Amino acid sequence: MLLLLAEFLQQFYKGFAVFQYLSLRGILGVLTALTLSLCLGPWMIRTLQMRQIGQSVRNDGPQSHLSKSGTPTMGGALILSSIGISTLLWADLSNRYVWVVLLVTLLFGAIGWVDDYRKVIEKNSRGLPSRWKYFWQSVFGLCAAIFLYTTAPSATETTLIVPMLKDVRIPLGIGFIVLTYFVIVGSSNAVNLTDGLDGLAIMPTVMVGGALGIFCYLSGNVKFAEYLLIPYVPGAGELIVFSGALIGAGLGFLWFNTYPAQVFMGDVGALALGAALGTMAVIVRQEIVLFIMGGVFVMETLSVVIQVASFKLTGRRVFRMAPIHHHFELKGWPEPRVIVRFWIITVILVLIGLATLKLR
């Protein structure tokens, strides 16, 4: 939006041309979303408290969590509003990738909002029934996949890239739709499963989102893409603005979500942010890199799958409780230790993911 204004004002003062630079608009995206999140956070927390929109805590979980009962939830709306406003202000709104990522994020956030609303406002412990949650996730995920497939200008944008193997590129054809569906929906649910401790999900999301922003910036520049032997995706660089907005909104939210949390993001935030990561990775053909960098999300998801499968097949549980962060809590780890160690793991995995840019 402001880019259009800057282009108009260039005829009066050439200095406004500086807003053409993606790097500047990415930084402004961070600062705008961060400011919005920090300024609106206290108001949102007070509003949630007044409306008694608080988290309910399971009795069979770690006893330390009982003190969290009543903590305001649905704070993900703060993240999404900050991301949305910042992106609309600083991104090129004629870029189709910006709209795809933004709409997927908001639509998955809407699913989470309905789920949270039914749990917290209507006091329905089931929330949105799983079949309906997965149905709408599938609808939105498939719509995004089909759109990206049908509008792909070249086969490069529907090819699976294998990191560190520069000559291995697998044309997916219609299989691109299937892969995209699973990446977006899988990422959405993986982040949601991880969101069980104060700050546990948001910081890895910020780190992975920032790294994907770097991939988007490089993939959108033909010279960088050719030098690094990564797919050149025209227009993908504009997603650095969305990535910046995600970083700023996430850090602003973490200010209030750090242990002991003043607010939780709820499904409205977790489902949306996971879908955003998946969509960005698909656009720049870095699904495998997302799998690496989002290793904490993968670990959390696998722990649930293993726990459920083991109990159904043998009647025994592999972990004391799933997702796995609760397993470590029940082993006696203090909550901050679990959180920070998972952050450290994410830092390492993100660095490995970024290293694949040169290891080819």
From Swiss-Prot:
Enzymatic class: transferase
Transmembrane segment boundaries: 25-45, 73-93, 97-117, 135-155, 170-190, 199-219, 236-256, 263-283, 288-308, 338-358
Names of required cofactors: Mg(2+)
Keywords assigned: Cell cycle, Cell division, Cell inner membrane, Cell membrane, Cell shape, Cell wall biogenesis/degradation, Magnesium, Membrane, Metal-binding, Peptidoglycan synthesis, Transferase, Transmembrane, Transmembrane helix
Catalytic reaction(s) noted: UDP-N-acetyl-alpha-D-muramoyl-L-alanyl-gamma-D-glutamyl-meso-2,6-diaminopimeloyl-D-alanyl-D-alanine + di-trans,octa-cis-undecaprenyl phosphate = di-trans,octa-cis-undecaprenyl diphospho-N-acetyl-alpha-D-muramoyl-L-alanyl-D-glutamyl-meso-2,6-diaminopimeloyl-D-alanyl-D-alanine + UMP
Gene Ontology molecular function: metal ion binding; phospho-N-acetylmuramoyl-pentapeptide-transferase activity; UDP-N-acetylmuramoyl-L-alanyl-D-glutamyl-meso-2,6-diaminopimelyl-D-alanyl-D-alanine:undecaprenyl-phosphate transferase activity
Pfam families membership: Glycos_transf_4 (PF00953), MraY_sig1 (PF10555)
GO biological process, one term: cell division
Xref: InterPro entries: Glycosyl_transferase_4, PNAcMuramoyl-5peptid_Trfase, PNAcMuramoyl-5peptid_Trfase_CS
Membrane-topology annotation of the record: Multi-pass membrane protein
Main location: membrane
A GO cellular-component term linked to this record: plasma membrane
NCBIfam families listed in its UniProt record: mraY (TIGR00445)
Function per UniProt: Catalyzes the initial step of the lipid cycle reactions in the biosynthesis of the cell wall peptidoglycan: transfers peptidoglycan precursor phospho-MurNAc-pentapeptide from UDP-MurNAc-pentapeptide onto the lipid carrier undecaprenyl phosphate, yielding undecaprenyl-pyrophosphoryl-MurNAc-pentapeptide, known as lipid I.
Name of the protein this chain belongs to: Phospho-N-acetylmuramoyl-pentapeptide-transferase
Originating species: Pseudomonas savastanoi pv. phaseolicola (strain 1448A / Race 6) (Pseudomonas syringae pv. phaseolicola (strain 1448A / Race 6))
This protein's encoding gene: mraY
